[in-house]
Every structure is written in C-alpha cells, then in structure tokens.
C-alpha cells in the first residue's frame, strides 16, 4: 500500500505548494484578490495551476485511497502512478511556458491523462463496490 500513499501525499503536497505559490505571487504583484486576465502574468498562471489542481487532486486522492483498500490488479496501481504524474505534468504545462495563451503538449497530455486515469480509477472503485 506504499505506492498509493505516496501518490496521495504528492497530490496533497502539490495542492498546498501551489496555494503557497499563489500567495507568493499575490504578494509580489501586490494584489490581494482577483485574477489578472493576461495569460502571461505569473499570478494568472499560479491561480490557474492551483485552481485546477484543487478541482482534480482531491477526487483523485479519494479514488486512490478507496481503490487501495482492496486487493487490486496491477493496472490499478499503475493507473494511480500515471494519474499523479499527469497532474504534475499538467501543472508544469501551466507554470513553465511564458504564456497560457498557446496550446502546450504538457498541459494537453496532463489534462487528457487526468481524465482517462480518473475514469479508470472510478471504474476500479465501482468494480470493487460490486464485490
């Protein structure tokens, strides 16, 4: 059960680190609330990375935890790892490029991978529920 716990820890830490990044970017921009509309703005990118992570990471963490509570097939374990990697890739795809205005392969693969692995984990939990 170590791998699921590591995935959950990474996703949880990612959410908090990105939240801290938003706070730091707000301090630097001297903007206590709101979001700049410029997709090149570091605060805009920080907010989008954190907000998107806050949407998906908790659901993935719950699915990973529930799936880990039963005897699981190896594909379920690998799906947990890939889901976690996809979230990291997505965040990198937002924060690393100069602007969010252009399509980015890291962001695309991270998002698509999150959707696919999220559904796979939900199916695994559903199958577990059937007994």
PLM feature spans:
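Short alpha-helical packing/oligomerization segments
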Residues: 64-86
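Physicochemical signature of membrane-embedded alpha-helices that form the seven-helix bundle of GPCRs
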Residues: 7-10, 47-50, 79-82, 106-113
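N-terminal signal-anchor transmembrane alpha helix
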Residues: 2-31
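Cytosolic, membrane-interface loops and tails of multi-pass inner-membrane proteins
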Residues: 20-48
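Juxtamembrane boundary at the C-terminal end of a transmembrane helix
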Residues: 122-131
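Core segments of transmembrane alpha-helices
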Residues: 51-64, 118-119
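Interfacial loop-to-transmembrane junctions
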Residues: 89-117
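Juxtamembrane loop-transmembrane helix junctions in multi-pass integral membrane proteins
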Residues: 2, 42, 46-49, 71-74, ...
């Amino acid at each position: 059960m170590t791998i699921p716990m590591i995935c959950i820890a990474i996703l949880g830490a990612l959410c908090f680190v990105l939240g801290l990044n938003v706070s730091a970017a707000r301090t630097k921009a001297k903007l206590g609330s709101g979001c700049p509309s410029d997709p090149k703005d570091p605060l805009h990118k920080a907010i989008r990375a954190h907000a998107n992570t806050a949407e998906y990471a908790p659901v993935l963490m719950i699915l990973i935890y529930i799936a880990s509570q039963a005897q699981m097939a190896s594909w379920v374990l690998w799906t947990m790892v890939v889901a976690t990697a996809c979230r990291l890739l997505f965040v990198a795809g937002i924060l690393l490029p100069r602007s969010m205005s252009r399509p980015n392969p890291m962001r695309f693969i991270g998002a698509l991978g999150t959707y696919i692995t999220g559904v796979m984990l939900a199916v695994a939990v559903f199958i577990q529920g059937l007994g």
